[in-house]
Amino acid sequence: MQDTHISLAHGNGGRYMRELIDEIFARHLANPELDVQADAVPIDIDGGDILFTTDGFTVQPLEFPGGNIGSLAVHGTTNDLAVAGAIPKYLSLNAFIEEGLAIDVLLSLIHI
């Protein structure tokens, strides 16, 4: 990877993101059992496989017609599991919280 700093291009799903994943994360954090590069990975737990995935979303505005970033995150993540043939039972949390976000806005997005 030629870049010396992370840019927005590294998060857009294209070539720069692939280079970042392959040359930084996969190279240094490789795990052959998890290295399937799919939306959901099978993990053997106590003799039974589960499918695990986590996803991250950013969108502006945080609330939009028909939903908000919270509903987008839940539906996007459970969709990754469903298309892999799993029945979603649990969710992991991957939160990108911008500096200056009002706590009330955060609470409204997670429905507390």
Which residues does each predicted region cover?
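Alpha-helix N-cap/helix-start and coil->helix boundary motif
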Residues: G14, L93-N94
